[in-house]
């Protein structure tokens, strides 16, 4: 990802993320779902997802957010993962299909989104 900046010296942050591609007003979990569901290798997400969400919850509590449980965070993550299909469809519609790099990126994004959706059973959230 060209918007992931990795620190190379000891005084740098290990990772900085710059995201200006699709500015919108949304809950923070939407960004978490996008990062984990579409931009993280499937096997890494599967292995680290719950630990990262636990860390996210600790961070929220550290900065004064109260009343959240892991179960709430998990359910919110699943809902936001379902919603990120809207983002994937919007981005796909704006890419130039003749651009090889864009096509490869989109293929990875959809593959990862599909895997996350299946793993998290997000379609079970839809009314029947």
State where each predicted segment sits:
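Active-site activation/catalytic loop segments of kinase-like enzymes and analogous catalytic loops
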Residues: 22-65, 81-103
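Regulatory N- and C-terminal appendages and interdomain linkers associated
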Residues: 11-13, 71-128
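Intracellular signaling interfaces of 7-transmembrane GPCRs
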Residues: 64-72
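Secondary-structure junction/capping motif
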Residues: 4, 27, 69, 103-106
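Active-site acidic catalytic loop and adjacent metal/ATP-binding pocket
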Residues: 1-28
């Amino acid at each position: 990802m060209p918007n992931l900046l990795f620190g190379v010296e000891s005084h740098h942050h290990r990772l900085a993320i710059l995201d200006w591609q699709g500015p919108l007003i949304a809950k923070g979990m939407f960004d978490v779902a996008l990062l984990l569901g579409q931009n993280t290798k499937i096997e890494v997400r599967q292995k680290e997802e719950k630990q990262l969400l636990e860390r996210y919850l600790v961070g929220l509590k550290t900065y004064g957010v109260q009343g959240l449980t892991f179960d709430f965070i998990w359910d919110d993550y699943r809902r936001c993962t379902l919603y990120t299909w809207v983002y994937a469809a919007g981005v796909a519609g704006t890419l130039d299909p003749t651009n090889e790099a864009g096509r490869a990126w989109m293929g990875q994004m959809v593959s990862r989104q599909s895997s996350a959706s299946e793993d998290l059973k997000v379609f079970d959230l839809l009314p029947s």
